[in-house]
């Protein structure tokens, strides 16, 4: 069946030439016809496309190339055909360039396509097909992704459903890792044209894989296979999904799919690489190499080439062909993307094999950057950095290994690596890591702990000072090495030698020198070239003071290794210890002349110290001193340039600055060194020296003392001398003497110490002798010390050490001591005289003190006797008072009985209601009688006031008169009857209205007596002699009955010189002070007649009672205002005891008279109320 034909018009005629597509002639023939007939361009393009469809690409290219030049453009819209011609040819070149393997040919094709697209741009730039072709060309170039994206975007703006543009955008989004966006474009293209080729669904499948939607990806790949059973991409995709399931059946299915893909396209690099990976795990390395090499040569995609090279490299690696493996690993890293780090892992292993740890570290760092928590990479990097000398890298290694041990706590190797890193910085951490490793070995692995680990643990304990633990681990390591020697004798014997050496060092530290020496010599018998043993034996001899023996051991080491720097350094130190500066300097210079040790820090420091030491020797050549300073400074600077953290060099620079006189700068240097480390004793001493030079002696003393405590277990005489010097300059001579004496105990034969002790003794003695306040003991002791200093100086001036001090100076000091001793007798005599005077003065003062003490003792004894006598008198007075009280109580009872008989005839309401209180209303004598109290209360109140004199009683009276009446009235009544006292009204209210009387309980009727107590003495009428019990609180006598008022009126008519008996009846002036005469006359005139003729009304009586009560409280008694009678004066002395006793009783029972007053007032008020009723 004919596919069709095309007509070519003949020139200048109406005829045409018809060419059948099934029988197209050769290209050249067609071109000649087209040229001859001057055929239009669109016919050229149609014929060219037909040739392309039939696979005749050469004719296709020839036709389009000829059409560019010879095509007829003389017709409408020829520009579009012209552009189509150029774009079609360019698209062909782009397609060929994509397939081309040769880089030069590929480059030529791209150049031709670029030229053609540029020419087309000049014709119609914004044609959709032209833009699509140009965008695909940009995608091929790879580095013009954004330009292609812009052109696809432009096309989609004009035609949103343009499928090539949608597929182009999907491709760009996928390459930019925007998998969701790419999937969206694929879906849109599929919706626009559901009949899209299988490649569209293949692209969707890849998007689903990247989005981790594996089931949808499987469906997409399967659908692509349904549409195109030869879609290799879909077969590979499904195969990878099957292989990743890691099950036997899935792996089998995956391999079958790959084989099917290989059958369809044997040159597909993706298929070849996956098959190579499969055969690698089957250990068929020849097939791996064949397939991978074939894949490498069949692709220009670098990612594919990297995969192929990696497969080749690891096949050679596993066959131990490390050179070929290195080559392919390296080539794979050149092609690999940043995410494909497996080649770097293999390459790093190859670098480790070659010993290039730096490049190996870089390779593993790239792997770790892509996979930050990869266990194997961190472990390898940790091991690599652990062996580095760079502390920063060691810190990185520590971090990596800690992460490894956290992720896999049972990894013994990681714990051991971590412990080895921590050995330098964290001994306790290293011990802990070793402990964990040993525990895992014993518990999890069920294996014995290797002797290497035991030796390392012992060494760590040794560094910590745990000598016992260290010995235990060293011995265990030796036992373990002997047991393991059966398997590898040479290796474990070497370990035993190292452990034996460590054990010998331990014995040295434990001061078991004999055992250490024995071990060293045993090692040397088996291994005569073990240089360290010679050095340790020499060091032990040096520490014992056997310098010659030490030198012999060091020379033995030099016979084995003539250029051994440690041996030459130790020999040089022997010379320096003997102050042989020249030979010592030559030894260190010899070390620095060797090429391998020309920058040896220790030797350079030693040379600097030699030049610095020469500055301590006395010299007058300032130029020479300056040269030595500059040389030492230059050496220390060189050391700092080589090692910026060398503290000893910094300390040396500070010392040179101090010698130059720059004390402040030197102090700053020393301070910085001490901040960096406090474990260098020289820095402390240098700081103290600077303080002395700056005259900060207190700080210097503290620094020296701290240095002694921190660094020297025993007394170091050199540092003690520095301390004594600071104390001497500070003026603390006594402390200086004690410090030097301690040093003399350590080094009794040291002549410098002896000189300094003598000098301090001399200065102390001089200061004591010049001080006129010094006592005899101090002066005698100073003379004794001066004699001792003289003997010391005399001895030192003859046999002193000329190298350490000037003997002439000792002789001069001896003469000065002799001069002072010649003047000492004057000072002794002066002190003796002063001492005698002080002794006499002290004796006199002691005598006066003794007299004063005896006088005080005598006065105290007299006072005690007086007090005892007074107490005795008081007791006697109390006894008399008690007797008198008993008599008065008896008398009061008889009087009351008489009064009751006289009042028995009265009647009426008054006698009934007021009768229970009438038994208490007596004459004036009864008013003054005391109320019987409970014995317990009377006794207590009386004893409190016994012994008070009359003046005391008088003061109490005056004081108590100021109390308000209401307060006085409530106490006794409530105390007598038991209930709690009630608050009374203020005095103003009592004046207006008499208070309602409180009723006593029936049990108390007839039992209350007057509380006034009258002295039994007949002649005590004077107010100064007579004291009644209720002193200080005057009575209200106006509250008694009419007969009481009558009796009082009669007493007013009697003379003032009545007998003692009448005065006793009228009451005591002290205990119950009377009203003045004017007041008494008023009472008489107001109350005399009514009491006989009529009964007063309640209101009148209440008024009278309140007025009289107020007057009684405010004034002094009648007897207070009149002079005492002569008879009372004559009996004053005889009655003083009785008066005092009564006064004491009254003042002690202050509540009793108050109760009596209230009783009287209550009785008067009750009478008034009865009458008014």
Curated annotation (Swiss-Prot):
Top-rank taxon: Eukaryota
One Pfam family matching this protein: TPR_10
Modified residues (Phosphoserine): 932, 941, 943, 970, 1020-1021, 1039, 1041, 1043, 1081, 1085, 1087, 1097, 1102
Keywords tagged on the record: Nucleus, Phosphoprotein, Repeat, TPR repeat, Transcription, Transcription regulation, Wnt signaling pathway
Positions annotated as TPR repeat: 41-75, 129-162, 163-196, 198-231, 235-268, 306-339, 341-374, 412-444, 451-484, 497-530, 531-564, 566-598, 613-646, 647-680, 681-714, 717-750
Region Disordered: start-end pairs: 892-1173
Keyword Repeat: yes
Record-given protein name: RNA polymerase-associated protein CTR9 homolog
Modified residues (Phosphothreonine): 925
GO biological process: blastocyst growth; blastocyst hatching; cell surface receptor signaling pathway via JAK-STAT; cellular response to lipopolysaccharide; endodermal cell fate commitment; inner cell mass cell differentiation; interleukin-6-mediated signaling pathway; negative regulation of gene expression, epigenetic
Tissue distribution of the protein: Widely expressed.
Subunit structure comment from the entry: Component of the PAF1 complex, which consists of CDC73, PAF1, LEO1, CTR9, RTF1 and SKIC8. The PAF1 complex interacts with PHF5A. Interacts with KMT2A/MLL1. Interacts with STAT3. Interacts with SETD5. Interacts with ERCC6. (Microbial infection) The PAF1 complex interacts with Zika virus French Polynesia 10087PF/2013 non-structural protein 5/NS5. The interaction with viral NS5 proteins may reduce the antiviral immune response by inhibiting the recruitment of the PAF1 complex to interferon-stimulated genes, thus preventing their transcription.
Residue spans of biased composition, Basic residues class: 900-912, 955-964, 980-994
A single MF term (Gene Ontology): RNA polymerase II complex binding
PROSITE patterns to which the protein is assigned, alphabetical: TPR, TPR_REGION
Keyword Transcription attached: yes
Positions with biased composition (Low complexity): 1148-1159
A single cellular component GO annotation: euchromatin
Compartmental location: Nucleus speckle
Biased composition (Basic and acidic residues): 1023-1034, 1129-1139, 1160-1173
Biased composition (Acidic residues): 917-929
Compositional bias ranges of the Polar residues kind: 1098-1128
Function, in words: Component of the PAF1 complex (PAF1C) which has multiple functions during transcription by RNA polymerase II and is implicated in regulation of development and maintenance of embryonic stem cell pluripotency. PAF1C associates with RNA polymerase II through interaction with POLR2A CTD non-phosphorylated and 'Ser-2'- and 'Ser-5'-phosphorylated forms and is involved in transcriptional elongation, acting both independently and synergistically with TCEA1 and in cooperation with the DSIF complex and HTATSF1. PAF1C is required for transcription of Hox and Wnt target genes.
